[in-house]
């Protein structure tokens, strides 16, 4: 019998090994996704969960940011809107969209989840608006948003050219320690409230105006509507006209 050459025996052995490996692979179950793939982060949120956002906008999600900020519109005329304690972006979104359609550059924001340092929430929204192209900014808000605006206005620099307070008043725990705190802000202030506001004592807005050393406009209407209720109440036309005139004058 003829003997096989060593080279032929090596070739046969290699072929056998390859056959075994292929067969083993075919019988093995499909490998599970890698641990890294399983931990892939979900896509970052690009808009708030409420409303339909049209036109130019930019959304800063939370997390990773301490509080969410929505920027609407463009240009140098900036407005920061702070909602009530029970609201945020979604609460003021209709107003923000209306202002953006009128040519204003608007920032709306949520309050941080830890319910602390609300002034920092408005400051972050203001900084985001300035970074997005605003040059002159009016801080505005309703109830908590109003008192926080009154409290932080003097600390945010010369870009802040006015404050609109709708049902704002002093609250040491939320960012406006005392009525006298506004004395350090020299810019114009619009103060809107009802005579029988259910949150702050009668005369609060007038006392804030008296403590303010800059120009101020005081609008006090009959009734007990508070914050956003005033924009839809029986004196809404007077209030909205005062807000429009203030924005036109300062921006």
Language model: regions and residue ranges:
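Short beta-strand/loop motif that positions the catalytic acidic residue
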Residues: 185, 191-193
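The serine-hydrolase catalytic nucleophile loop
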Residues: 85-95, 111
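Conserved alpha/beta-hydrolase
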Residues: 96-115
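Active-site glycine-rich loops that stabilize anionic/oxyanionic intermediates
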Residues: 74-76, 83-87
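Short alpha-helix in the alpha/beta-hydrolase fold that links the catalytic acid
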Residues: 178, 201-210
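Gly/Ala-rich beta-loop-alpha elbow adjacent to hydrolase catalytic centers
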Residues: 141-149
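N-terminal cap/lid segment of alpha/beta-hydrolase-fold proteins
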Residues: 35-72
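Alpha/beta-hydrolase active-site loop
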Residues: 114-132
């Amino acid at each position: 019998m003829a003997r096989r050459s060593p080279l032929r025996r090596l070739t046969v052995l290699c072929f056998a090994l390859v056959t075994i490996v292929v067969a083993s692979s075919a019988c093995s179950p499909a490998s599970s996704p890698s641990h890294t793939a399983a931990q892939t982060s979900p896509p970052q949120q690009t808009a708030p969960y409420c409303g339909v956002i049209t036109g130019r906008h930019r959304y800063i999600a939370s997390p990773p940011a301490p509080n969410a900020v929505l920027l609407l519109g463009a240009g140098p005329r900036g407005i920061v809107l702070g909602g009530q304690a029970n609201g945020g972006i979604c609460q003021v979104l209709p107003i923000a969209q209306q202002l953006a359609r009128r040519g204003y550059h608007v920032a709306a924001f949520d309050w941080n989840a830890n319910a602390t340092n609300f002034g920092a929430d408005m400051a972050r929204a203001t900084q985001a608006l300035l970074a997005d192209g605003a040059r002159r900014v009016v801080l505005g808000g309703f109830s908590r948003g109003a008192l926080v605006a009154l409290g932080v206005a003097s600390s945010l620099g010369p870009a802040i050219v006015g404050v609109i307070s709708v049902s704002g008043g002093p609250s040491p725990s939320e960012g406006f320690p005392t009525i006298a705190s506004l004395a350090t802000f020299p810019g114009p202030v619009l103060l809107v409230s009802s005579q029988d506001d259910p949150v702050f004592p009668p005369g609060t807005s007038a006392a804030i105006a008296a403590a303010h050393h800059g120009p101020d406009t005081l609008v006090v209407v009959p009734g007990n509507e508070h914050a956003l209720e005033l924009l839809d109440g029986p004196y809404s036309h007077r209030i909205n006209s005062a807000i429009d005139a203030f924005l036109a004058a300062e921006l």
